[in-house]
């Protein structure tokens, strides 16, 4: 039974990752209204007409439905056969976040909402993926969340502060997409050919996100340097901080590629999905470090 639970946990994490990526595609392709103002039907049908926008939106809905069924099965088996309280917490939070984002998605179709609320939809998807990833890790060698070395309070503060700040940066990125402000800054690293552009409208929104992303990179770089200096002998802390730096570096690069590809619609959609997927991985590694700091208190 343990192997079945592990497989379902892995499928859940993969499914949540796919939902997050497809949600980013829905936003980038402006397909959120691809099924009109109907839910769960799409233009009055279970199988909609084969337009691009309806196909993207309906595929996203279908994947959410299938993954939700997998989560329910995983939830039952974890509470029935797994004794670890952290596993029960992770699957509970995954299910809760998935249900909330599904409800928000349905409401967004029926009653159009502000960009501030729509951006939160991606944030909830990110949390759902992070919890599902932690659940999957429970059944691996990384799932024994006790670090090999005591962690200083300063490092713990840096980990948690960086993780919370990363969520804010991700929210700003989602807000950029939902306000269709991406074109506010043409070119990278300069914005409209300027180091500091006129901070109005879409340009101000995009430039704020860029500065926030730069500060996030510096925070994770500081996290990595501290881990290398003090915790290189701890495989788990070293693993999490190293991959957090790798993914935030890829995030910066992919953000630049998204800007450069704005003239090509296909490339723009593809790079936007890649950017969202890298963001999810980065946040997942930061959450893993947070769990290590929590369990250090019990060591």
What are these regions (language model features)?
Residues 1-299:
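Polytopic transmembrane helical bundles with strong interfacial aromatic enrichment
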